From Swiss-Prot:
Lineage, top ranks: Bacteria, Pseudomonadati, Thermomicrobiota, Thermomicrobia, Thermomicrobiales
Listed name of the protein: Transcriptional regulator MraZ
MF terms in GO: DNA-binding transcription factor activity; transcription cis-regulatory region binding
Domain of life: Bacteria
Quaternary structure and interacting proteins, as annotated: Forms oligomers.
Keyword Mitochondrion: no
Keyword annotations of the record: Cytoplasm, DNA-binding, Repeat, Transcription, Transcription regulation
């Protein structure tokens, strides 16, 4: 389970250290793809597989489903962890998420999100403003 928020530097080669407490679940590799909110999403293989199967089962005749499949799979890449627990963030994914010198690494239970400090600050502001009403709307689902 991934919990917490951490700030890490991105080196000149585009490598990012993943927090030590998260690394064991990845067993040396994971799948990195675009997140929905201008962040990147990093999945352990055992979390990625069920998600990939669900997304793949969406009807190809539905335009929204096709667009979502492209969003999830077109930029997805398998990343390997080096001995220092770093992954390489491909340039196109860094550009999408606005990542430059620093990243906010956020545990979201079964996956990890990687945010630029600016995008994370905007998201945190949104959560502070709308969090109570979001919780109220979703309370019936829990």
């Amino acid at each position: 389970m991934f919990l917490g928020r951490f700030t890490h530097a991105i080196d000149d080669k585009g490598r990012l250290a993943i927090p030590a407490r998260f690394r064991e679940a990845f067993r040396g590799q994971g799948v990195l793809t675009r997140g929905i909110d201008r962040c990147l999403t990093l999945y352990p293989m055992d979390s990625w597989q069920p998600l990939a199967e669900k997304v793949s089962s969406l009807s190809i005749s539905d335009p929204d489903a096709r667009a979502f499949r492209r969003m999830v799979f077109a930029e997805a890449t398998v990343v390997e962890f080096d001995r220092q627990g770093r992954i390489l963030l491909p340039p196109e994914l860094r550009a999408y998420a606005g990542l430059e010198r620093e990243a906010i690494v956020v545990g979201v239970h079964s996956y990890v999100e990687i945010w630029s400090p600016e995008n994370w600050a905007a998201q945190a502001e949104l959560l502070a403003a709308e969090g109570p009403s979001i919780a109220q709307r979703l309370a019936t689902l829990i």
